[in-house]
Amino acid sequence: MENMKLNNNLECPMLGLGTFMLSPEDAYTSTLEALKMGYSLIDTANAYVNERAVGRAIKDSGIDRKNIFLSTKIWASEYENENTVEETLERLGVDYVDLLYIHQPAGNWLAGYRMLEKAYREGKAKSIGISNFEGKYMEELETKWEIVPQFIQVEAHPYFTQKELRVTLDKYGIKLMSWYLLGHGDTALMNELVFAGLGKKYGKTPAQVILRWHTQMGFVVIPGSKNAEHIKDNMDIFDFALTDEEMEQIAKLDKNERYYHRTDEQLVQFANWKPEFEK
C-alpha cells in the first residue's frame, strides 16, 4: 500500500474501501473483509446509512484504531444540528474520525464547514474535507474558510480529470479523492484499447490499470464492492507503475465530460432530506 502526506502532515492511504450503495449487512461484511486483507482506509457517510455497520466491523476486526483511516461525511440536512458530529461518532463507535467531510454544497453549507473546523480544532476530526464542491461553491468557500481542507471528494476518471479544479487544489495542497472512478460502469471507458493493452503488458485488468492511473495522478481511490474477490483485486495495483509515456496516452482520453450532473433543484432536495439512521 502507498500513502500520501496531507497538507497538515497527516498520512493517508492511496486506496481504500468505499461503502456507497452498500446495505448495512454488506457494508459490515465488506469492511471486515477489507480490513483483514490489509486495507486501512474506509469511507462512509451519514447518507449511506451504514455507519453503525462500518463501526461494528472496525471493532470486530480487532485492528488497533490508530491503524485505521476512517472517513465519513456530514449530510446537508445536518449542517445546523450542533450535535451532529457527536452523533456521527456515536454511530461509528469511535472518539474521532481521520477525515470528516461536508457532503454537498446544499443548505447552510457554511455552517457545516464551520462545524468541521470546530471538530478539527477539538481533535474529533484529524483532517477535514469537502465533497462535490466545484465551480462557484469552491470559489466562495476559498474566501471563507479559516482552516484549509485536506481533501475534496469529487467525480474523477480518465474521461474527466478535473483539470480546472486541480489548479485550486494544487495551490493549497488539497488532495483529491475520486468517485465514479471507473466511469460508473461505463463499458466505453473500460473497453478503451489503451487499458486492454496496458493490462496485457502488466498482467492486470483494465480496472486495475485505471485504479493505478488514479494513484499516479495523485488521487486517492475508494472503489466499493460487496465481492471479496473484487475487493482483493482492487488492492493489487501497487506492484507495477505506468510510465510517463503511458500516463500521457491515458491523458488523451480526457473529454472533460462528467457522468453526474447535479441541479439546483437537487441541492434543495438534499438540504431537506433527512437520512433514516440505523438504530
Segments (PLM) and residue ranges:
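N-terminal binding-site loop/beta-alpha segment at the start of enzyme catalytic domains
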Residues: 1-68, 182, 277-279
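Short, acidic/polar
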Residues: 22-34, 78-93, 111, 136-139, ...
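Acidic-and-aromatic substrate-binding clefts and catalytic sites of carbohydrate-active enzymes
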Residues: 22-25, 45-53, 75-80, 105-110, ...
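A structural motif
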Residues: 39, 94-97, 125, 149
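Short catalytic-loop micro-motif centered on adjacent basic/acidic residues
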Residues: 40-45, 71-72, 101-102, 127-129, ...
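A short, structured active-site edge motif that brings together acidic residues
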Residues: 65-78, 98-105, 132
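CE4/NodB-like, metal-dependent polysaccharide N-deacetylase domain
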Residues: 81-102, 118-122
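Beta/alpha (TIM)-barrel catalytic core signal, keyed to glycine-rich beta->alpha loops juxtaposed to Asp/Glu
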Residues: 104-279
